[in-house]
From Swiss-Prot:
This is Syntaxin-4. The lineage of its organism: Eukaryota, Metazoa, Chordata, Craniata, Vertebrata. Keywords: Cell membrane, Cell projection, Coiled coil, Hearing, Membrane, Neurotransmitter transport, Phosphoprotein, Transmembrane, Transmembrane helix, Transport. The chain crosses the membrane at residues 275-295. Its main location: membrane. Plasma membrane t-SNARE that mediates docking of transport vesicles. Necessary for the translocation of SLC2A4 from intracellular vesicles to the plasma membrane. In neurons, recruited at neurite tips to membrane domains rich in the phospholipid 1-oleoyl-2-palmitoyl-PC (OPPC) which promotes neurite tip surface expression of the dopamine transporter SLC6A3/DAT by facilitating fusion of SLC6A3-containing transport vesicles with the plasma membrane. GO terms for cellular component: apical plasma membrane; basolateral plasma membrane; cell surface; cytoplasm; dendritic spine; endomembrane system; endosome; extracellular space. Residues 38-163 form a coiled coil. Belongs to the syntaxin family.
Length: 298
């Protein structure tokens, strides 16, 4: 899922409805608030953000542990178990976020009845933005694990080439990996190859890791597809809202510049008035003196 945040289209006309949403939406430090916020709704939004922050942290930790295990020829069982526990935590957090997003999703009846309500449209926007962020995070995790799987397969392939001069083709390797059972996988290798015990142990360990990975990827994919279609449908609306938010910031900045210019012009006008008043006063004084002298002489 591509990041839409940096692909805002230029030149779109901003409708009156979107102006209302733009005015109502204030983005600050990752939070969004209505001018008259629904406390319960935004408490749920805050909870979702916190859960997603935990999920993102776990995904980063998973990436680090995968790198460590890939660099270890024969990782200890505790390392593999720790990695699997981390995957389970990620799946659990993913399910929690999915349920939380479902809880704040505006019901169709409510959305239809209050379509013109800024509050309703604000909730739909919040749900859409959070859903998009969640899908992108899950997609990143899935891609990361798929890449990790390929690296494990490559390790097995290298071991087989070293011990068997490449007698096992890539197609045969994939078929053995798809057997679903480590015992079958190992026995298939032993039939036609002379593999050292250490190499066999590593191959078996990598195959077991691949099996766990594939289960995790399938389960995460189910979470991913749950929201992906909806996010794709809402993407256009989110793009417009984001564009309007950025436009609002631009409007504010330009407004501040205009105010500054107006204040400077006001100061200049005030100075001109003072100078004119002084000139008029001096002129009146001179005229008064001239008239006074004329009367005295006469």
């Amino acid at each position: 899922m591509r990041d839409r945040t940096h692909e805002l289209r230029q030149g779109d006309n901003i409708s009156d409805d979107e102006d209302e949403v733009r005015v109502a939406l204030v983005v600050h430090s990752g939070a969004a608030r209505l001018s008259s916020p629904d406390d319960e709704f935004f408490q749920k939004v805050q909870t979702i953000r916190q859960t997603m922050a935990k999920l993102e942290s776990k995904v980063r930790e998973l990436e680090k542990q995968q790198v460590t295990i890939l660099a270890t020829p024969l990782p200890e069982e505790s390392m593999k178990q720790g990695l699997q526990n981390l995957r389970e935590e990620i799946k659990q957090l993913g399910r929690e976020v999915r349920a939380q997003l479902k809880a704040i999703e505006p019901q169709k009846e409510e959305a239809d009845e209050n379509y013109n309500s800024v509050n309703t449209r604000m909730k739909k926007t919040q749900h859409g933005v959070l859903s998009q962020q969640f899908v992108e995070l899950i997609n990143k995790c899935n891609s990361m694990q798929s890449e990790y799987r390929e690296k494990n397969v490559e390790r097995i392939r290298r071991q087989l080439k070293i011990t068997n001069a490449g007698m096992v083709s890539d197609e045969e390797l994939e078929q053995m990996l798809d057997s679903g059972q480590s015992e079958v996988f190992v026995s298939n290798i032993l039939k036609d190859t002379q593999v050292t015990r250490q190499a066999l142990n590593e191959i078996s360990a990598r195959h077991s890791e691949i099996q766990q990975l594939e289960r995790s990827i399938r389960e995460l994919h189910e979470i991913f597809t749950f929201l992906a279609t909806e996010v794709e449908m809402q993407g256009e609306m989110i793009n417009r809202i984001e564009k309007n938010i950025l436009s609002s910031a631009d409007y504010v900045e330009r407004g501040q510049e205009h105010v500054k210019i107006a204040l400077e012009n006001q100061k200049k006008a005030r100075k001109k008035k003072v100078m004119i008043a002084i000139c008029v006063s001096v002129t009146v004084l001179i005229l008064a003196v001239i008239i006074g002298i004329t009367i005295t002489v006469g």
